[in-house]
């Protein structure tokens, strides 16, 4: 399944808003830098109509080596989570389902 890249996002900004290509790329880079910086400071990032990004700490837990069956400890870690906002969920539900290409 294709994915939207930062370069494609910058190109779409160039086409839709009329910024030059350099400004579009800089804007996309700055946006993601600001999101990452806020998360690194422990702040949630809430984008109205889109969703929320936040850092969550996962507790340590026992894991299992699939080859040997040996129990191994999995360290505590921090992960980024995204929760889609109501408007985004609604837009996705309103879209007609398109079958994925094989």
Swiss-Prot record:
CDD domains in the cross-refs: IHF_A
MF-aspect GO terms: DNA binding; structural constituent of chromatin
Record GO biological process: DNA recombination; positive regulation of metabolic process; regulation of DNA-templated transcription; regulation of translation
Keyword Transcription regulation: yes
Any Pfam family: Bac_DNA_binding
Transcription is among the record's keywords: yes
Record-linked InterPro entries: Hist_DNA-bd, Histone-like_DNA-bd_CS, IHF-like_DNA-bd_dom_sf, IHF_alpha
Keywords: DNA recombination, DNA-binding, Transcription, Transcription regulation, Translation regulation
GO cellular component terms, semicolon-separated: cytosol
The organism's place on the tree of life at top rank: Bacteria
Record function comment: This protein is one of the two subunits of integration host factor, a specific DNA-binding protein that functions in genetic recombination as well as in transcriptional and translational control.
Family listed: Belongs to the bacterial histone-like protein family.
Binding partners and assembly: Heterodimer of an alpha and a beta chain.
Family annotation (HAMAP family): IHF_alpha
Name this polypeptide is given: Integration host factor subunit alpha
